[in-house]
Amino acid sequence: MQLRLGEPPLTQAECALVYCFAPSGENATFSLPAEIASLDEKVWSGLVAEAAQEQKFQGKPNSSLALRLPGPIRKLVLVGLGDPAALTLEALRRATANGLRQAHSLKAKQVVLSLPDTGLDQVRAVQAVAEASLLVAHQDNRFKSPPKPEEERGFSVEEVTLLVPGLAQARQDYENALQRATEMAAGTILARELVAAPANVVTPPALAETARQLAQDYGLEVEILGREECQALGMGAFLGVAQASDLPPQFIHLTYKPKEGDPVAKLALVGKGLTFDSGGLNIKTDSRSIAMMKTDMGGAAAVLGAARALAALKPQVEVHFIVAATENMISGRALHPGDILTASNGKTIEVNNTDAEGRLTLADALVFAEKLGVDAIVDLATLTGACVIALGEEIAGLFTPDEKLAQELQQAANLSGEKIWRLPLEESYFEGLSSTVADMKNTGPRSGGSITAALFLKQFVEKTPWAHLDIAGPVWAEKDSGYTNKGATGYGVRTLVEWVLAREMAAASS
C-alpha cells in the first residue's frame, strides 16, 4: 500500500473516508462534517443525510456507513469516532481500519482520508492512521495456491492519501510520522509472518537465517552461536531443552549501533524462541493446544520485528536483540522430569515439568544480555496460560521490580495501542519453586502461575533494570478486530520500538 500526504479540501476521489464525531451534550443531534454536508446539499441532493438517518448512523465508535454515489466522489465511507473528548490514538486506529474495511467492501483502490482536528497531537494522529492503514491491509497468502483468474484475493485498497490541515507548515514532521508508521508496520508484519508460518518452515535455523538477512539488509552486527559455543558459555538450561530435537539450537544475537556518535542508551530485547513446543515428555495432550505451538516463538518474532523497524529508523541508541531458538521435542535424548540443569550463572534447576521450557531458554538468554552491560532488559515470551486466564487474549502481563521501567513501558504501550497490565512480583510466591535437590524448580503450584514464572526469570538478572512481558494471550487473534486480522498479530513490535525511541528522546532532552 502507498501512503501519501495532501491538504484539504476534499473535492474529488474514487473513495473518501470521512471521520464523524458523535453528538455530545443533552438533546444534541448528529450532523455531517461540514465538507460532506456541503457536498451533500450541492451535489447529492441530501442522499448522504438521508442514508445516515435511515441507517441510524450517529458517529458512534465502531460504526460506519458505506455508500455509492454519483461523482465527484463515487464511494463514500463515514466512520464514527464517538465523543471527541474521549478520543484516543487507538480509537483513531480502529476507526481507520473499520473505514478501510468498508472501502475494501466497495472494491475501492484509491482512498482519500480526511483527517479532522482530533484534539490529539496531530503528528501522532497521522502516524496512528498510517499504521492502521498498513496493518489492516496486510493479508498473508504465502501458503495458498495462486488464485484463479476470476478469484479476488487480497486487500483492494492500494493507495491512501491523508489530507492534513496545515500540512505545509509542518510537512517534515508529518513525513517523519509516515516513515515511523511504515517501518513499525513492516516490523509488525515480519513478526506476524514469522508467527503464522508453520514449524516446518520457521525452524531454529530459519530464525537464524532471518537474523542474518536483517543484518545484511540493515547493517546490523550478527552473532549466531551453535550447540558447542553455547556449551562453552555454560548454557545448560537452554541446551537441556534443545537436546531432544534433531534440529540444531541457534542462539541469535543481533546488534544495532548508531553509525555516528556515541549511543545515548544501551538496551537489550530478549525473545522466547520455541519454534515448536510439544511439551516434551510432559506432552501436551490437548490437540488444539499443541497445534498452536508454532506460535511459541512470538517473543522472538517481536524482537526480530523490532530489529527490522529500529534498524530502519536509526535511533541514537545501541540495541541488542537476543533469541535462544530451539524446539521442545520428544526423543530418546529428551529431558526427563526430575533432571537437574545448570544455567550459565551457575544456578541449578530441577525440571519438574518439561512443558515449562520457555523459562529455561530465557534463563540463559537473560544472563547473556546482562553480561553485555546494558542499561535495561525487556523480555517477551508466550510464557504461561495462567496469564491468558488472568488477562484474556488481548492484554499482556507486565512484570518488573523497576518503577521507572514499568512507567516507560506503559507509556510506550499507550502510544502503540498494544495493551499491557502490570501484575505483581510477589516474592513470597517464590517459595512455591523451592527444591530439595537444586536451587529451584522450574514450576510451582497451579495458582499464580504467571507470577511464579516471572519470579523464576528474575533469578537470572542480578542488577540490571528488567521487565518481563507475558504475551501468551495477544500473540494470536481468533477473529478480525480493528487493524488486526485473524491470525498472528505481531504483538509487541510497536511497543518495543516506541520504548526505544522514547529512551532516545529522554536522553536528548536531559
UniProtKB/Swiss-Prot annotation:
Residues that coordinate or bind Mn(2+) 1: 277, 355, 357
Q: Where is the active site?
A: 284, 359
Key words of the record:
Aminopeptidase, Cytoplasm, Hydrolase, Manganese, Metal-binding, Protease
The UniProt catalytic activity note for this protein reads: Release of an N-terminal amino acid, Xaa-|-Yaa-, in which Xaa is preferably Leu, but may be other amino acids including Pro although not Arg or Lys, and Yaa may be Pro. Amino acid amides and methyl esters are also readily hydrolyzed, but rates on arylamides are exceedingly low; Release of an N-terminal amino acid, preferentially leucine, but not glutamic or aspartic acids
Q: What class of enzyme is it?
A: hydrolase
Give the residues the record marks as binding Mn(2+) 2: 272, 277, 296, 357
Compartments it resides in: Cytoplasm
Q: Which GO terms describe its cellular component?
A: cytoplasm
Its annotated function is as follows:
Presumably involved in the processing and regular turnover of intracellular proteins. Catalyzes the removal of unsubstituted N-terminal amino acids from various peptides.
Q: Read off the NCBIfam families from this record.
A: PRK00913.1-2 (NF002073), PRK00913.1-4 (NF002074), PRK00913.2-3 (NF002076), PRK00913.3-5 (NF002083)
Protein family (similarity comment)? Belongs to the peptidase M17 family.
**What is this protein identified as?**
Probable cytosol aminopeptidase
What organism, scientifically named, is this protein from?
A: Synechococcus sp. (strain JA-3-3Ab) (Cyanobacteria bacterium Yellowstone A-Prime)
